[in-house]
Structure formats: C-alpha cells, structure tokens
Amino acid sequence: MNVYSVIKKPHVTEKASLGSDATNTVTIVVDRDANKIEIKQAVETLFKVKVDSVRTVNVAGKVKRFGRNFGKHSNWKKAFVTLSEGQSLDFFEV
C-alpha cells in the first residue's frame, strides 16, 4: 500500500488530546485495509519520528436518519500511535 494513502487525517477529540499529553500517543484515522506495520512505516516516513507501538480499532459506522429514510455511515479504522521518548508530532504546526 502507498505510504500516502495509509494516513487519512488526524482524529482530534478531547479524549485523544488527553491521551497525547499523558502517554505521547497520537490518534489517526487510517485506511481500513492498512495493517500495523504499514501504519508504523507511513508515520515514520512522512513525519520523521520514531514509533514505539501501534494499536488499531475498527469503528462501526453509526445508523443515521435522513428524513424518513435510514442510512449508515461507513465503517472506519482508528490507529493509536505511541511515539518514542522525546519525539512529538503536532498536526497544527505550520
């Protein structure tokens, strides 16, 4: 899988920001077909940081109503990437 197609976007929530402060962990939305090895290689290549571990979660899409009709958001995959000591990753740096 191409390195640029593995990482989709950062998953920025209040809970994710608390985890990043305490354990040096970054939460990222990744491609559903990507495995932990591909995610680790993509983060290390694109952001020039050292990764200690990667944990992944398959998140089920929610059922939503669109007027009278029911629809479903797509399933997606979330990765918790733990960076090495002294490494940092800030998505909002310019």
Curated annotation (Swiss-Prot):
**GO CC list:** ribonucleoprotein complex; ribosome
InterPro entries per record:
Nucleotide-bd_a/b_plait_sf, Ribosomal_uL23-like, Ribosomal_uL23/eL15/eS24_sf, Ribosomal_uL23_CS
Pfam families associated with the record:
Ribosomal_L23
Does the record carry Ribonucleoprotein as a key word?
yes
Q: Which domain of life is it from?
A: Bacteria
In the record, biological process GO terms are: translation
Q: Which UniProt keywords apply?
A: Ribonucleoprotein, Ribosomal protein, RNA-binding, rRNA-binding
Cleavable signal peptide: none
Which Cys-Cys disulphide bridges does the record give? none
Any one GO molecular-function label of the UniProt entry:
rRNA binding
Explain the purpose of this protein. Answer: One of the early assembly proteins it binds 23S rRNA. One of the proteins that surrounds the polypeptide exit tunnel on the outside of the ribosome. Forms the main docking site for trigger factor binding to the ribosome.
- Quaternary structure and partners: Part of the 50S ribosomal subunit. Contacts protein L29, and trigger factor when it is bound to the ribosome.
Q: Which NCBIfam families match?
A: PRK05738.1-3, PRK05738.2-4, PRK05738.3-2
By sequence similarity, the record places it as follows:
Belongs to the universal ribosomal protein uL23 family.
Its name, as the record gives it, is: Large ribosomal subunit protein uL23
State the species of origin.
Answer: Pelobacter propionicus (strain DSM 2379 / NBRC 103807 / OttBd1)
Gene designation: rplW
